[in-house]
Amino acid sequence: MPCVQAQYGSSPQGASPASQSYTYHSSGEYSSDFLTPEFVKFSMDLTNTEITATTSLPSFSTFMDNYNTSYDVKPPCLYQMPLSGQQSSVKVEDIQMHGYQQHGHLPPQSEEMMSHSGSVYYKPSSPPTSSTPGFPVQHSPMWDNHGSLHSFNQNYVATRGGHVPRLSLFSFKQSPPGTPVSSCQMRFDGHHVSMNPETSGAHHVIDGQTFAVPNPIRKQASMGFPGLQLGHASQLIDSQVPSPPSRGSPSNEGLCAVCGDNAACQHYGVRTCEGCKGFFKRTVQKNAKYVCLANKNCPVDKRRRNRCQYCRFQKCLVVGMVKEVVRTDSLKGRRGRLPSKPKSPQEPSPPSPPVSLISALVRAHVDSNPAVSSLDYSRFQANPEYQMNGDDTQHIQQFYDLLTGSMEIIRGWAEKIPGFSELHKQDQDLLFESAFLELFVLRLAYRSNPAEGKLIFCNGVVLNRLQCVRGFGEWIDSIVDFSSNLHSMNIDISAFSCIAALAVITERHGLKEPKRVEELQNKIVNCLKDHVTFNNGGLNRPNYLSKLLGKLPELRTLCTQGLQRIFYLKLEDLVPPPAIIDKLFLDTLPF
């Protein structure tokens, strides 16, 4: 049986079979030429095109930088190098070439040529040595597979017309470190043939030529030459490697308006962090008073927010946090509902904790005003037509009814002012009777809408300004003008509640305990000053507090006009005034 042998000449030192070029001739002889170390190529007589596979061996790149030549890539047919350093040869015999067929028939000459089994002797290169001392040389598992060449020859099938052409070159190139391991590809005349192990037994048709790449080749290619071309590898890396997540703050989160820390939602009307929310809540519930040790302009940020409690609380008010929204201890967990009545009146209730003064004033004002849904429009006329010679009795009686109906409501409001019920009983009556007409005008002007000509009274009755002319006389025109001026100042409910309280808590002639009244008045003034000074509107209007307090003398003038109207109606004697109005008139006359 003929034997095909490969004869080699002298090999340069350190050469290996991978650095030799094998060429098959028609005579059945093999010749080998050593290539230069710069271009190490393994030539096989398969086609005239080139099969390129990049190897991805990241561990080699670290230790091969000192070499001037490329390292040798061992094909799957080589056995593992002996570590003893001795030069030896290995003989591979009985290599059978199968599978060359055309339309299921094997040509005689091809069958005879490929049925020959020969002996090929390989001369291994010297064992590799590590350039780094102490680093062990690791061997790939493919060197231990001694039957890889045999399996390659038995499973490789190439269907092509004619004789086997010259072997093309297999180029083995070093891939950069980090290239992902993948199956190699074969290039035939500009086409790619994949050696992916997932497509077992796949056939590739190229210009009418079928190439079947079996599992052993794909396995060896995946083990020995794991890498795509650089273009495919870069695409694979871009598609598989996720980008690192950004470390920025979440988009659904903002910054605290007080200290600049992260704030997820709004608290008491302003987006603030949990720390500033709790600080503001505790301060309001305990009615705490702070003192600044500096010039009341301490910086308040995330790092220094705990240094000065006074400046921190003032900044909370400046950015717009509303103290009235904070629930007191008696309303905790009740969602703003009023506390229920005690089950048994005999049980003494525990003393209530200190409540914010301005919060109590706002609550008293809201409770004493009619709700929008309960307004009475039954007597409202948008364009009333009055005859000057009509009966005035009905309009005068309506005037008295509106005054008496408002009196009980305003008295109930005054009793809810913190500290008012603790005053002397005679002082309470004197303060209320002296300020009733002032409070009647002030509350009516704040509730009404002068632009539309609507007047909303304490009992919920809505009337047109023209409907009140016959009963109120010229006094109603002064009230409407005062209402327009009051609305132009854009007074919020907190400031108005303080102004209304100051209208009744003031110095009057004949007080039994004027000192206690003065102390209560100072508390309300300071509360109004703090609210106006550190409110957003107050900072832009430096004289805003003076304008608010200037409304109190105007109320005194309007009160005098009201007394004059009552006095005129008494003289007219068309309708006798109610006893309570008559007593009020006699007790409050300044002359």
UniProtKB/Swiss-Prot annotation:
Pfam families: Hormone_recep (PF00104), zf-C4 (PF00105). Residues 345-354 have a biased composition (Pro residues). Residues 253-328 bind DNA. Residues 1-22, 110-133, 330-354 are annotated as: Disordered. Keywords: Cytoplasm, DNA-binding, Metal-binding, Nucleus, Receptor, Transcription, Transcription regulation, Zinc, Zinc-finger. InterPro entries: NHR-like_dom_sf, NR4A1-3, NR4A2, Nucl_hrmn_rcpt_lig-bd, Nuclear_hrmn_rcpt, Znf_hrmn_rcpt, Znf_NHR/GATA. GO terms for molecular function: nuclear receptor activity; sequence-specific DNA binding; zinc ion binding. GO terms for cellular component: cytoplasm; nucleus. The keyword Lyase does not apply. A motif (nuclear export sequence (NES2)) lies at residues 561-570. Its main location: cytoplasm. Residues 353-588 form the NR LBD domain. Residues 8-22 have a biased composition (Low complexity). It is found in: Cytoplasm; Nucleus. A motif (Bipartite nuclear localization signal (NLS1)) lies at residues 280-307. A motif (nuclear export sequence (NES1)) lies at residues 436-445. It comes from the Eukaryota. A motif (Nuclear localization signal (NLS1)) lies at residues 331-343. A zinc finger (NR C4-type) spans 256-276, 292-311. Belongs to the nuclear hormone receptor family. Transcriptional regulator which may play a role in the differentiation and maintenance of meso-diencephalic dopaminergic (mdDA) neurons. This is Nuclear receptor subfamily 4 group A member 2. The gene is nr4a2.
